[in-house]
Amino acid sequence: MSRILDWSGDELSSYYLDTEIDLSWIDKSSRHQFRWKSLKGPWITSDRRISSSKKLIELFSNSMPTDVYVSTSSWLDPINLPRIKDTKRPSPILLDHLVVFDIDIRPFCLIRLEEARKATLNLRNWLIENTDIKIRHITFSGSKGFHIIADDPDRESFSEPDPVLREEKVKSQRKQLLNRVIEGGHPVDKVVTADTRRVIRLPGTVHGKTGWVCTILNDEWIELPVNEWINKIPRHDSAIKIPKRPPIRIPKFSLSKMNLRFPSKKIASFPQYTSLELSSHVSGTNDRSAFVSWLPRKWGDIRTSIELSLIHI
């Protein structure tokens, strides 16, 4: 990633105060939990039911968010949900759970995003051919990949009256599907799909690390190369430019790990000094630097003197 965004409250508010976040893809948004990472630092979980974009953005006024998420599950009461292991409070009643697959390929660049698109397309086609789930849409996360959002028509697990057992059965059902997908060789996140308490990035909101907007794709876009539609994705004015390829990484070089081979024969006459020369010169280039050092004879033989020199380099 070319640079790190340093958001200000004014930059974020200029986007959200002029934007309507489309929640229509969620059957009943008031049954979902909304969370966001605030510009001030802490994570905030909505303490109100969210039924519209306006109500959600009103909650941002105290501290603008860098990243906004929504739960994959819907609950009878999504406010102040108890933790799974909390036995002191009544267990929440799970009403529905979206089937979500997350595919990310790092880093954020066109080449890796194209790889993620192809992987997402392959998974979409596999799901259509091998399962009964109904795909709602595919979302560009705003950074390194995509989310497939779907519904499972098999509602048998939700007929369980005990809320704890119901949630366990739904998780087990999702885990079985996830295992099939992984066994099929698809590079999906191994946690998101089977986690009933998971939150995913909310479409229509800014990705805090890139400035690009998490966006529901037109159905045909996932079948087209990324470079044919990426410029149609909305982004904040401060968004970073998406690199074409990953940054070049120079491998770490350590002389101490080199397999230095020295002759075992004794040298008849020893010079007063040992010369150690290191150079970054590459054939055909100019103006490359070189490091030359004389090592004291009193440091010992060649191997010992080089080992001692490495301590000082």
Where are these regions (language model features)?
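Long, charge-rich alpha-helical interaction segments
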Residues: K175, E220-K266
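Histidine-centered divalent-metal-coordination microenvironment in nucleic-acid enzymes
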Residues: L98-F101, I135-D162, V199-P203
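Short Lys/Arg-enriched alpha/beta "domain-start" segment
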Residues: S283-T285, F291-S309
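Helical (often loop-to-helix) elements that flank the catalytic cores of nucleotide-handling enzymes
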Residues: M1-L5, G9, K40-K54, S91, ...
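Accessory, usually C-terminal, subdomains that scaffold auxiliary metal cofactors
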Residues: V192-C214
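Catalytic micro-motifs at enzyme active sites that drive phosphoryl/nucleotidyl and oxygen chemistry
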Residues: R83-S91, I128, D132-F140, P187-K190
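Conserved small/polar residues in nucleotide/adenosyl-binding loops
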Residues: I311-I313
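SsDNA-processing nucleotidyl-transfer enzymes
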Residues: E20-C109, L113, K190, I250-S269, ...
